[in-house]
């Protein structure tokens, strides 16, 4: 199977991005491809739900196959982490939500959080902090075991399993220092996971 790839086109004046994605081999990734018996890793990060056709498909238990992979990773002693993709569809509740009880740390942007919870966050207008907090808590109530981490242009909000909210404002950089926003969510997730790995929290 061909390698998966994504071409990102950014409109120069508005910085609006368009993604052209080819699933390639990622569509064929299946539960049997994962062996956690000999790993010494602390964290298993799975991304992106909604782009992994075989793992997004329902397994024998009626949940997406990704749930079984995450369950086995957790049973092997790994902290599980998941990121999903901003897809314009109604699949968030059928593919992502059933997996959440197997997730220790969830990453979602404002669009994805709205799709998962049905709570409008004020995207593109003025972010509603109360709604963001409610959405983060709702994701924990849907099953996320440790942290539901939401990120958006204005910053980030994380909700712990105890319902505690942690807020972080976005960093303001000079426009000349910003080459683009492609990968911003991935960089955010990497930073949070590094902090968890190093036991900063």
Regions found by a protein language model. Name each.
Residues 172-201:
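Conserved post-catalytic alpha-helical subdomain immediately downstream of the catalytic base
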Residues 1, 5-167, 171, 197-200:
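Ribokinase/PfkB-type carbohydrate-kinase core domain
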């Amino acid at each position: 199977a061909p390698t998966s790839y994504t071409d990102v086109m950014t409109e120069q004046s508005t910085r609006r991005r368009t993604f052209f994605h080819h699933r390639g081999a990622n569509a064929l990734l299946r539960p049997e491809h994962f062996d956690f018996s000999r790993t010494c890793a602390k964290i298993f990060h799975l991304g992106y739900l909604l782009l992994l056709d075989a793992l997004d498909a329902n397994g024998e238990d009626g949940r997406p196959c990704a749930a079984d992979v995450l369950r086995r990773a957790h049973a092997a002693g790994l902290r599980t982490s998941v990121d999903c993709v901003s897809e314009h569809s109604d699949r968030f509740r059928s593919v992502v939500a059933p997996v959440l009880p197997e997730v220790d740390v969830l990453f979602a942007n404002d669009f994805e959080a709205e799709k998962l919870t049905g709570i409008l966050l004020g995207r593109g207008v003025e972010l509603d902090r109360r709604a963001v907090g409610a959405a983060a808590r709702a994701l924990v109530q849907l099953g996320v075991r440790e942290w539901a981490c939401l990120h958006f242009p204005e910053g980030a909000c994380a909700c712990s399993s105890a319902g505690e909210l942690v807020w972080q404002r976005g960093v303001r950089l000079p426009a000349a220092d910003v080459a683009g926003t492609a990968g911003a969510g991935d960089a955010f997730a990497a930073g949070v996971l590094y902090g968890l790995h190093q036991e900063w929290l």
